[in-house]
Amino acid sequence: MKSRKIVLAVLLALLVPMGALAQSAAQELDVNELQRQLQEMRSQITRMQSCIDELKRANANAGTSPGAELVPQNQSGPSQGLTSPPDKSAPSSTSPPKSPTTFSSGAWLFKIGGYIKLDMIHDFNAIGSTDTFNPRTIPVDGSQGMNTRIHARETRLSLGITGPVNDRDFKLFFEGDFYGTNNAFRLRHAYAQYRFLLVGQTWSTFMDEENIPNTIDFETPLAAPLVRQGLLRLTTKPSKRTLLAFGVEESDPEVVPPPGVAGKTEKTVPDFTGRFRYTNGRGHVQLSGFVSRTRFRPNTGDPTDVTIGGVLVSARYRSFGRDTVYAQFSYGPGLGRYRGDVSAAPDASGKLKAVEVTALTAGYEHYWSPRWSSNIVASPAWVLSHLADPNRRFDYVAANLRYWFLENRGWAGLEYLYGLRETRNEMQGHANRIQAALRINFP
């Protein structure tokens, strides 16, 4: 009996330490497991941070130019017919960050936009357009003369309103500058947009408002149609990358009457416009056109009707980093209608015909750094018709350098401009200009 007690005592003495060892081992296993899980979590966090950094770098490389919400200084128009103009600071379907010029009322967002721009211009040769560089106004009679001009007429003020109507974005946009007579406020844009319908005044459907060269000069090159007018536009997207738009727009052709004949120009039908655009991640290609009809009614005799029209091929491609190459080609009888020129003129027999015009624009925009950029563009145009229009050829060349500051809300720039005008009797006029500008965008 005593021996059994001794055996039991020995067993108990052995089991107690073994139990403690087992418990200690289990605790050690739990600690090791926790350490393994923590290490795995650290690895996941590291991988997630790497992904976030990579996304930030990608976004920075793919970003637009500084101040992109206020586009290339002299343009604005509905992006692809579905969004607000690039340079108008109009609210988009997603609410922009709050700023002193952005406020809301319920579900409606209001954005006051625009900028102040000072232009300092020096002409080394005579030219009729002192505020813009228009080769059509270059004299060919050998006139000499210099001119210095400082103005702020391009300064803009806009109001964009966005809100939901039946769970769809409804947009209103108003914009003006001071290019009216005697620096008066001038309406540029005033339109409403809901789903596929846009009504009001804005850039014509015929033009490519997303491919207007980024010149400091307000005029822009010759192949880019540049018209804002009253219109009704329908837009649809057949696929994710394609867009179709059709417009009925104000017609405003300029007609040169036959020699010695007095009368008036009648706008018998509107301009019918259309565009097709294909877009991918690096740029877009657009084909657009317009057709219309105008009439000259002499004070005595029968009226003459003339059909006018034109086509535009436009392309823009992001080449390296933020650099962009772009080109436009336009052609048509009566194309001058969209560049402030003559649409119809009489031939040698006095019969009224459309003036046939073709133009080309090619340019490259380069970013030297996040704050420094340059743009160079060349644009010739030819008047093909042998009509009463005395002009035969125009050239427009521009090269500039910009520096962005104030957190990309302002820039200073310097631009050189060269222009040529040549007439059918082989007379020529040349113009050289230096233009400096300072622009401050609204917050």
Model segments located where?
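Bacterial N-terminal signal peptides
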Residues: 9-18
